[in-house]
Amino acid sequence: MAPSRLQLGLRAAYSGISSVAGFSIFLVWTVVYRQPGTAAMGGLAGVLALWVLVTHVMYMQDYWRTWLKGLRGFFFVGVLFSAVSIAAFCTFLVLAITRHQSLTDPTSYYLSSVWSFISFKWAFLLSLYAHRYRADFADISILSDF
């Protein structure tokens, strides 16, 4: 079932705000805290949120109808970055535990693992929406063939 315009607008707004937050995390943790792990995962979360925003905007503009292979590519990119984010989450969590880092330290690997999980969330949402929109347009294209 196709989402309403309100749902699409809310999804797009949430994606846009989250992409700005991810890029802000990238800048702050690169310049101020000099913690590349958190900066990288925050930047990845921002890029993935921006990609989800592009997915929603292209769905609203009806661009996907003629380019279903693009949605398939977005799905596989989401799956790839889901795996990368889970691996980064586990790695940062193990590093934080073995180095006995504080939970409240802004330069600890615990914060990097949190942003790895947020990156996983956006990668998962990219795959989910690409799959749903592709199924939605595949049904429409089957009906339009008759």
UniProtKB/Swiss-Prot annotation:
Induction of expression: Induced by iron via heme and non-iron metalloporphyrins in macrophages as well as by erythrophagocytosis (at protein level). Also induced by hemolysis.
GO BP terms: erythrocyte differentiation; heme export; heme export from vacuole to cytoplasm; heme metabolic process; heme transport; localization of cell; lysosomal transport; phagocytosis
Tissue: Highly expressed in the brain, kidney, heart and skeletal muscle. Moderately expressed in the liver, lung, placenta and small intestine. Strongly expressed in macrophages of the reticuloendothelial system.
Membrane among keywords: yes
Catalyzed reaction equations: heme b(in) = heme b(out)
Localization (cell): Endosome membrane; Lysosome membrane; Cytoplasmic vesicle, Phagosome membrane
Chain positions of motif Di-leucine motif: 142-143
Topology with respect to the bilayer: Multi-pass membrane protein
Keyword field contains Transmembrane: yes
Membrane spanning stretches: 12-32, 40-60, 74-94, 110-130
Alphabetical list of InterPro entries matching this protein: HRG
Superkingdom of the organism of origin: Eukaryota
GO cellular component: endolysosome; endosome membrane; lysosomal membrane; phagolysosome membrane; plasma membrane
Keywords, alphabetical: Cytoplasmic vesicle, Endosome, Lysosome, Membrane, Transmembrane, Transmembrane helix, Transport
GO function terms (MF aspect): heme binding; heme transmembrane transporter activity
Functional summary from the UniProt entry: Heme transporter that regulates intracellular heme availability through the endosomal or lysosomal compartment. In macrophages of the reticuloendothelial system, is the heme transporter for heme-iron recycling. Essential for macrophage iron homeostasis, transports heme from the phagolysosome to the cytoplasm during erythrophagocytosis (EP).
Record-stated family: Belongs to the HRG family.
PANTHER family per record: HEME TRANSPORTER HRG1 (PTHR31525:SF1)
Name used for this protein in its record: Heme transporter HRG1
Organism encoding this protein: Homo sapiens (Human)
